[in-house]
């Protein structure tokens, strides 16, 4: 998502702000199996996002193909797929920036694109790139962004301290954005998306280009938002990010859903055993040697993926090839994608 789309979607009507509105909306919290706190509910969970048989055709090309999924209020739902899978197109349709060729979309209980502007008043967006005003200070960026929502200067200034605390940028309030590190800029971009106290956050590749410590800081901030009852739609091509953050996810390929469910369930149901990666030999020749001792074999480039619970037998068979490198690890979402498509995900 680029700057033009982000600025276009920031045309909502006046929003009544209340710093306590998130907690006011939340019910008592309960512990769930993931260890995350989520709002409890005595009724069926409401759907923050609902797509029904949505198709998008652009220049005679089907970009999104009869896609259906729902995102429950209070969960983190992932759209996982390579570039060109349809993630950005789905996001544009959710924001009312593109009209589907067929199907129905509902966001926060409102039909989109019909009432997209009203829905956007309760949505925060973090685009893939930091669309910050580099010559402004951290504080000034938050102040200017709040005015897109027709908030008064007084209301924004009252909110800024809590946003700075959330982004862990209290000491950088009067520093120009151009002087911040990449991780600080991403935290500021995330805090900026909270100015209007949104119910739903749409995050497009939120940690792309960050080093591991900065990525973990962003993930920690996102978890705190989920505890507060926010709903997150996360688009990513990073398997570890999807596995760590998402309660459920939809795996996309060519605009089609090829799998949907909780990450660990997908891994268990589709893979179900550890993996040994074998490097440094001819995959075709090696596969003939180990095939009797594995459940399944996949090949990608020069790497042989052996899916097996009999790792000792596989290692024993490969000892006569001292130049080989072996990596034994638990299965992950990369293996799921490789199994479903026959190739590794393109970054």
From Swiss-Prot:
It is found in: Cell inner membrane. Gene3D superfamilies: P-loop containing nucleotide triphosphate hydrolases. Residues 17-26 have a biased composition (Polar residues). Keywords: ATP-binding, Cell inner membrane, Cell membrane, Membrane, Nodulation, Nucleotide-binding, Translocase, Transport. Residues 1-11 have a biased composition (Basic and acidic residues). InterPro entries: AAA+_ATPase (IPR003593), ABC_transporter-like_ATP-bd (IPR003439), ABC_transporter-like_CS (IPR017871), ABC_transporter_ATP-binding (IPR050763), ABC_transptNodI (IPR005978), P-loop_NTPase (IPR027417). Residues 49-279 form the ABC transporter domain. Residues 1-32 are annotated as: Disordered. ATP binds at residues 81-88. SMART domains: AAA. GO terms for cellular component: plasma membrane. It holds the Pfam family ABC_tran. The keyword Disulfide bond does not apply. Its EC number is 7.6.2.-. One of its GO terms (molecular function) is transmembrane transporter activity. CDD domains: ABC_subfamily_A. It comes from the Bacteria. It is a peripheral membrane protein. NCBIfam families: nodI, PRK13536.1. Part of the ABC transporter complex NodIJ involved in the export of the nodulation factors (Nod factors), the bacterial signal molecules that induce symbiosis and subsequent nodulation induction. Nod factors are LCO (lipo-chitin oligosaccharide), a modified beta-1,4-linked N-acetylglucosamine oligosaccharide. This subunit is responsible for energy coupling to the transport system. The complex is composed of two ATP-binding proteins (NodI) and two transmembrane proteins (NodJ). Belongs to the ABC transporter superfamily. Lipooligosaccharide exporter (TC 3.A.1.102) family. This is Nod factor export ATP-binding protein I. The gene is nodI.
């Amino acid at each position: 998502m680029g700057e033009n789309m982000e600025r276009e979607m920031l045309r909502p009507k006046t929003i009544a702000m209340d710093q306590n509105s998130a907690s006011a909306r939340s019910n008592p919290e309960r512990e769930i199996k993931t260890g995350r706190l989520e709002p409890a509910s005595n009724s069926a969970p409401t759907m923050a996002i609902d797509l029904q048989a949505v198709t998008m055709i652009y220049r005679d090309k089907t970009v999104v193909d009869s896609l259906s999924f729902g995102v429950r209020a209070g969960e983190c739902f992932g759209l996982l797929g390579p570039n060109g899978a349809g993630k950005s197109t789905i996001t544009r349709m959710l924001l009312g920036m593109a009209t589907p060729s067929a199907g129905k979309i509902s966001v926060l209980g409102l039909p989109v694109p019909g009432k997209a502007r009203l829905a956007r008043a309760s949505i925060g967006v973090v685009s893939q790139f930091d669309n910050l005003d580099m010559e402004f200070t951290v504080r000034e960026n938050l102040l200017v962004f709040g005015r897109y929502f027709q908030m008064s200067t007084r209301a924004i200034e009252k909110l800024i301290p809590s946003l700075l605390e959330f982004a862990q940028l209290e000491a950088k309030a009067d520093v120009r954005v151009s002087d911040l590190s990449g991780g600080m800029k991403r935290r500021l971009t995330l805090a900026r998306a909270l100015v209007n106290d949104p119910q739903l956050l749409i995050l497009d590749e939120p940690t792309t280009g960050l080093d591991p410590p900065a990525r973990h800081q962003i993930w920690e901030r996102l978890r705190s938002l989920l505890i507060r009852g926010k709903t997150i739609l996360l688009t990513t091509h990073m398997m570890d990010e999807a596995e760590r953050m998402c309660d459920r996810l939809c795996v996309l390929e060519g605009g089609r859903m090829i799998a949907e469910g909780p990450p660990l369930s997908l891994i268990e149901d589709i893979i179900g055993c550890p993996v040994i990666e074998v490097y440094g030999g001819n995959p075709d020749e090696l596969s003939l040697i180990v095939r009797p001792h594995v459940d399944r074999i996949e090949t990608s480039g020069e790497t042989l993926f052996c899916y097996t619970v009999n790792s000792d037998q596989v290692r024993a068979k490969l000892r006569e090839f001292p130049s080989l490198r072996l990596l034994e690890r638990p299965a992950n979402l990369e293996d799921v994608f490789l199994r479903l498509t026959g190739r590794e995900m393109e970054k």
